């Protein structure tokens, strides 16, 4: 049964990921989410069987069904990312010998699906535009704050416990975690760090608490530094410029930090990873 739950969650992630990609692409563009998707090359309205980029990419061998133009692999990132996120969220109990098929666990899992759906949209949007929309950070922050009244980490697993009074640590986590970075923004007048990242950390603090929240920040810096160093080494060895942004390589342009924060939040939550 545990394996079935993980498989269902992963498939659900593939399906929802397609929608989240549309949300990220159309966010702040004035386009309605109700409108049908179109081929970026020929403008042909896509049928229902073309609305899942991963399957379309594999079945059509990377080409549009109508004009045979190449389908950008960027379109499948959201599906793969969401599938991996949802699969890991559903599987988090396995790492601590917790039965997955129980009401409290499943309620928490569904709640985390909602939370990380918002975070994935932020992930994709920041990756493309290098900015975190305030409305998405606010939505995440509100849900994160609400979580401290209904969810807790029991035996290292995020689980539904029913309504309860949160501790002072839980209440202050949403302030404590982003505070140093907000001060850095204030002191540097935005030159060292943007304000979007501290806003995102408010929700992370409420969701994870102080200890796990601080751990997620450390892990995000490690992931970001490792990523940037890897790209630099590959560029140096092969004399190629990877991950270009216009005419600049990613090493010479602003590196979006929200994706690393979100990946670190997932890792910390799923594995209850404490580095301090």
What are these regions (language model features)?
Residues 1-276:
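A membrane-topology feature that recognizes alpha-helical transmembrane segments
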């Amino acid at each position: 049964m545990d394996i079935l739950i993980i498989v269902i969650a992963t498939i659900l992630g593939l399906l929802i990921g397609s929608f989240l990609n549309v949300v990220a692409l159309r966010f702040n563009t004035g386009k309605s989410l109700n409108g049908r998707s179109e081929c970026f090359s020929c403008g042909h309205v896509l049928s229902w069987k073309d609305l899942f980029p991963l399957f379309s990419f594999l079945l059509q061998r990377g080409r549009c069904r109508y004009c045979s133009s190449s389908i950008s692999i960027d379109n499948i990132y959201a599906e793969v990312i969401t599938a991996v996120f949802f699969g890991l969220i559903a599987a988090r109990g396995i790492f601590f010998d917790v039965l997955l098929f129980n009401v409290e666990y499943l309620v928490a899992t569904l709640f985390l699906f909602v939370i990380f759906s918002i975070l994935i949209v932020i992930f994709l949007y920041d990756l493309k535009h290098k900015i975190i929309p305030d409305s998405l950070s606010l939505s995440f922050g509100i849900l994160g704050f609400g979580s401290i009244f209904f969810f807790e980490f029991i035996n290292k697993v995020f689980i539904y416990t029913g309504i309860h009074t949160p501790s002072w640590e839980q209440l202050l986590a949403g302030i404590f975690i982003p505070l140093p970075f907000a001060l850095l923004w204030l002191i540097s007048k935005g030159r060292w760090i943007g304000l979007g990242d501290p806003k995102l950390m408010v929700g992370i603090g409420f969701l994870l608490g102080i200890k796990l929240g601080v751990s997620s920040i450390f892990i995000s810096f490690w992931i970001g530094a490792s990523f940037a160093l890897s790209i630099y080494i590959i560029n140096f060895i092969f004399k190629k410029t990877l991950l270009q942004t216009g005419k600049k390589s990613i090493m010479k342009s602003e590196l979006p930090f929200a994706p690393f924060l979100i990946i670190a939040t997932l890792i910390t939550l799923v594995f209850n990873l404490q580095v301090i």
